[in-house]
Amino acid sequence: MNQIDTGLVKRLIGEQFPEWAHLEVKPVKFSGHDNRTFHLGDKMSVRLPSDAAYAPQVEKENKWLPILRKELSLPISTPIAKGNPSEAYPWPWSINKWIEGETVTKQNVRDLSEFAAHLGSFLVELQSIDASKGPIAGAHNFYRGGLISVYDEEARDAIENNKDVFDETVLKHLWDLALQSTWNRKQVWVHGDVAPGNLLVKDGKLCAVIDFGILGVGDPACDAAMSWTFFDKSSRKIFKEVLQIDEETWNRARGWALWKALITYDANRDRKSTRLNSSHNVASRMPSSA
């Protein structure tokens, strides 16, 4: 496969959507891991899966996002057109409406507690939408909304590999707590990757939620993992209150955050990087975080 760059995007647009071939194509400032994203003019974006594992996300987003967006008060990713596999690129791809906003950071949020409340309210809205026909959590969304126990071996290996860095006993206890319960209520919609890179702010306030590639239905615990990766103690409390999360679900949410921090640290331990530092901070703070 050719490298995913502006040249490839221009070729695909020219071949499949010639009416937009005159528009400028340029990479977005922050592109994710699962997809490579490019501006298409001022009002659209092009998203191309970076690997075959992420290709099914295109069909899923095109099917469900137009339905979900009607029930949500905040803008979300909006598919405009779907590109087909071709000689130049082997998987389906999408053209979406461009949403104005900045990727959220601690520096551009007006008030962290306000942001936590607004994000919590959005997730409550998402969870209230009928999910009876939605895609059940599984391999297609890396089990977000499914049983966290699918990552048990991976998490325990990471704890063992890094017991010289973290408190092994405490982390094993937190992980065990996450495995002690399951979601036994009605399955709900989960975004699957509620993280700063997928949240936009304008004038310091949450203005949009994007990248629903690992959307699914199941246990909402995974969508609360940001409690430990972004919020401080007071904003974390507000987030929990707005979501009305019981303690067992809270333990599973913490488990999702712990698993991701541990495997990220384990994979990057031998090289200095922002990912190494941030994952270390999350795993180190977790024992003292309610």
Where do the language-model regions lie?
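Hydrophobic alpha-helical segments that form the core
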Residues: 254-263
